[in-house]
């Protein structure tokens, strides 16, 4: 289950993200590598920490 502050890995390219906010089936995430923020669907991620 994704919660604010969760460390996430994107399915497919395995990039790492941190969850900042959650609304319905969308999650605001920030990339650890490039520091960019974007709203994406929760199903694009798996929780790794």
Language model region names:
Residues 4-49:
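Basic/aromatic-rich interaction segments and small domains that mediate binding to polyanionic partners
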